[in-house]
Amino acid sequence: MKNQKNLAGVLLFIAGIIIFMGIITAESYYPLDDPYTTRENEISDLGATKPPNSIIKQPSANIFNTTMILTGIIILCATFLLQLESQNLLLTVPLGVLGIGVVGVGIFPGNITPWHSIFAFILFTAGGIGAILSYRFTRFPINLVFLVLGVIALFFLFFNELFIPYLGKGGTERFVAYPILFWMIGIGSYLAGTIQKKSAS
């Protein structure tokens, strides 16, 4: 890697892929005797459901929680590299808070209240804001995509009660989480790709 921004972009891209595949893997290992559905179950139910009567299913819980902790650390490393390279606070502040939220979700599964909910809210809020703010320093037309992803994430986060009757708790939460995940993969690709293009010229 020729510079820190390029490496940070690659790390964000990798973190997004690991989260996505980690969720899929944890879902695939969830026991069939207690079905997990994307409509009724929140993503974090893979780690542990909320009290009372919290349910923890292995190996799904270990897969999910480990994935969150690992990727949160990767995001924080990327944030550190970006701060050293550009000191773009519009990116590094929400990204750093996002990383802290991801780590917190892994350390404090759904059965640990109120900490899990606090870190999940931090994660979703920071991710949505980060996606919207990235409109300011990325180029057209991808900046519009990032803006829309951020708006979708925050809209479903703060108005989730409107959509739960139609999408379920799990479906509604995924309209918050997945746009943030797609933004993280996208901004990672953007940071890596633009630097490579400049280096080649």
Predicted regions and their residues:
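Membrane-interface helix-boundary motifs at transmembrane edges
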Residues: 2-5, 77-91, 135-144, 194-200
